[in-house]
Amino acid sequence: MVFRIASSPYTHNQRQTSRIMLLVLLAAVPGIAAQLWFFGWGTLVQILLASVSALLAEALVLKLRKQSVAATLKDNSALLTGLLLAVSIPPLAPWWMVVLGTVFAVIIAKQLYGGLGQNPFNPAMIGYVVLLISFPVQMTSWLPPHEIAVNIPGFIDAIQVIFSGHTTSGGDMNTLRLGIDGISQATPLDTFKTSVRAGHSVEEIMQYPIYSGILAGAGWQWVNLAWLAGGVWLLWQKAIRWHVPLSFLVTLALCATLGWLFSPDTLAAPQIHLLSGATMLGAFFILTDPVTASTTNRGRLIFGALAGLLVWMIRSFGGYPDGVAFAVLLANITVPLIDYYTRPRVYGHRKG
């Protein structure tokens, strides 16, 4: 009689990678819809550009490596990378920026390390950081949400601006960014940081139109709540685990609350941190990447808490208004160390 010896793992999750990626893509629909509503059709154009670029870049590398193109593209990981990058950049950023960022993310940050499962850093965030450092002006040129905007460009105008820099009527990006108070608007986090450095009081800052929302910044609060809804659905579907999002949000809220209580004249209130920028997108869709996050439950709690602390520190004291991308990459660096010290004890073995 011949006994077959199989290597671990001996228990398996029946869900394939492609299905999990598809669930994440579906969960992103509420967040995408909210961004389309508040910032216009540019987001959809960026998603289409990023998706096509990601698939072509991945196919090219797979062809060069003589690997199966069709089988790998079916895992949907390239599409997810493109999507996450596209929703992270301003909706009217030039077309070549999203193409450049996506190609860099797929080829350099993912395939250069061996493909899905081998990359130590989140590819979408690598692409985002490369663009942010290289083109800071374009990467911070967000439109004001439609609640306070003079006008939001339609689909044709969005395409025109993305590909040529001008609308059909001759308006440019600066014209579109002109807010109701006659000044160029930015995100709530960017506005807060810039205004504090200019010597304005928090009381004055919170009177700006960008903070006319019920809980936080106009438009941005609903965008974050939409991403939160998608994240809760992912938890319900058991596509992600709760450890990273919970520890991230609790740590960010705790740090923001303590900072605000000790320095209310210079630091943003907790609701600004939780419902502005890429907070919920990062908590449920970026930090939960199974490849670049910690693999143990205790490790996931530490990983999420570290990212939350880093986001608050970068937003409060760093040079960039939103620190999610940098926090994710810095936390990715610590994953091997976290996993080493949180690995479970082998059954039957005692600690030495």
Curated annotation (Swiss-Prot):
Its cofactor is FMN. It is a multi-pass membrane protein. InterPro entries: NqrB/RnfD, RnfD_bac. It comes from the Bacteria. It is found in: Cell inner membrane. The keyword Membrane applies. Its main location: membrane. Keywords: Cell inner membrane, Cell membrane, Electron transport, Flavoprotein, FMN, Membrane, Phosphoprotein, Translocase, Transmembrane, Transmembrane helix, Transport. The chain crosses the membrane at residues 20-40, 42-62, 89-109, 123-143, 214-234, 242-262, 267-287, 301-321, 322-342. Its EC number is 7.-.-.-. GO terms for biological process: electron transport chain; transmembrane transport. One of its GO terms (cellular component) is plasma membrane. It is an enzyme of class 7 (translocase). The modification FMN phosphoryl threonine is found at residue 187. The complex is composed of six subunits: RsxA, RsxB, RsxC, RsxD, RsxE and RsxG. Belongs to the NqrB/RnfD family. HAMAP family: RsxD_RnfD. Part of a membrane-bound complex that couples electron transfer with translocation of ions across the membrane. Required to maintain the reduced state of SoxR. NCBIfam families: PRK00816.1, rnfD. This is Ion-translocating oxidoreductase complex subunit D.
